[in-house]
Curated annotation (Swiss-Prot):
The lineage of its organism: Eukaryota, Metazoa, Chordata, Craniata, Vertebrata. Residues 1-15 have a biased composition (Gly residues). PANTHER family: MRG-BINDING PROTEIN, MRG_MORF4L-BINDING PROTEIN. It comes from the Eukaryota. Component of the NuA4 histone acetyltransferase (HAT) complex which is involved in transcriptional activation of select genes principally by acetylation of nucleosomal histones H4 and H2A. This modification may both alter nucleosome - DNA interactions and promote interaction of the modified histones with other proteins which positively regulate transcription. Residues 189-198 have a biased composition (Low complexity). GO terms for biological process: chromatin organization; positive regulation of DNA-templated transcription; positive regulation of double-strand break repair via homologous recombination; regulation of apoptotic process; regulation of cell cycle; regulation of double-strand break repair. InterPro entries: Eaf7/MRGBP. GO terms for cellular component: NuA4 histone acetyltransferase complex; nucleoplasm; nucleosome. This is MRG/MORF4L-binding protein. It comes from Mus musculus (Mouse).
Length: 204
C-alpha cells in the first residue's frame, strides 16, 4: 500500500533553538488518496460509531498503522473522519447492539410503607431520648431514694444487732449473778460449824 506523506519537510536546523523536533507520533499525516484507501481498508468490519466506537477505533488504528508503516494516534484518525462525516449524527443514529427499553421507575408500595413505619419508630425513639434528656434528675432522685432506703435498712439492722447483743449481755450477766449466788451459798454452808453435817463429823 502507499506510504504516508509527512508534512514539514524542512531541515531540523531551520527551526528555532527553543523548538524541539516532534516525535513520529505527533507528526501530521498528509491524507493522500493512497493513505485514505489504507484507512478504509482498516475500517472494514469496524464502525467507529455507537457505544463501542472507542474499541473499534483501537482496531482501526492498529491496522492503519500497520498498513502505512508508522504509528498514528487515534485523535488524528478521529479528526480526519470528522472532516468527511458528521460523526455525532452517526453516533446518535446508531442502533444499540443490545436491548435497552426505557420505562418510568415506580417505587413499590411495600418499600414506601416500610420507610414510613421506620420513620414513625425513629420519631418515637427520638421522643423518648428527648424525655430522658429533659428529665435527668428523675433518675438521680430514684437513685438517691433507693440509696436512702438502703441506708435506713442498714441502720435498722445495726440497731437490731445492738439490741440482740445487749439482750445477750444482760442474760449472761443474770446467769453469772445466779451462779455466783449459788456458789456463795455452797461455800457458806460448808464453812458454817453449826451445820448438822459438821456436828455429825465431830461426833464420829
Amino acid at each position: 500500500m502507499g506510504e504516508a506523506e509527512v508534512g514539514g519537510t524542512g531541515a531540523p536546523g531551520d527551526k528555532g533553538p527553543g523548538e524541539a523536533a516532534p516525535s513520529p507520533a505527533e507528526e501530521t499525516v498528509v491524507w493522500s488518496p493512497e493513505v485514505e484507501v489504507c484507512l478504509f481498508h482498516a475500517m472494514l468490519g469496524h464502525k467507529p460509531v455507537g457505544v463501542n466506537r472507542h474499541f473499534h477505533m483501537i482496531c482501526i488504528r492498529d491496522k492503519f498503522s500497520q498498513n502505512i508503516g508508522r504509528q498514528v494516534p487515534s485523535k488524528v484518525i478521529w479528526d480526519h473522519l470528522s472532516t468527511m462525516y458528521d460523526m455525532q449524527a452517526l453516533h446518535e443514529s446508531e442502533i444499540l447492539p443490545f436491548p435497552n427499553p426505557e420505562r418510568n421507575f415506580v417505587l413499590p408500595d411495600e418499600i414506601i410503607q416500610e420507610v414510613r413505619e421506620g420513620k414513625v419508630v425513629i420519631e418515637e425513639e427520638m421522643k423518648e431520648e428527648m424525655k430522658e434528656d429533659v428529665d435527668p434528675h428523675s433518675g438521680a432522685d430514684d437513685v438517691f431514694s433507693s440509696s436512702g432506703s438502703l441506708g435506713k435498712a442498714l441502720e435498722k439492722s445495726s440497731k437490731d444487732k445492738e439490741k440482740n447483743s445487749s439482750d445477750l449481755g444482760c442474760k449472761e450477766g443474770a446467769d453469772k449473778r445466779k451462779r455466783s449466788r449459788v456458789t456463795d451459798k455452797v461455800l457458806t454452808a460448808n464453812s458454817n460449824p453449826s451445820s448438822p453435817s459438821a456436828a455429825k463429823r465431830r461426833r464420829t
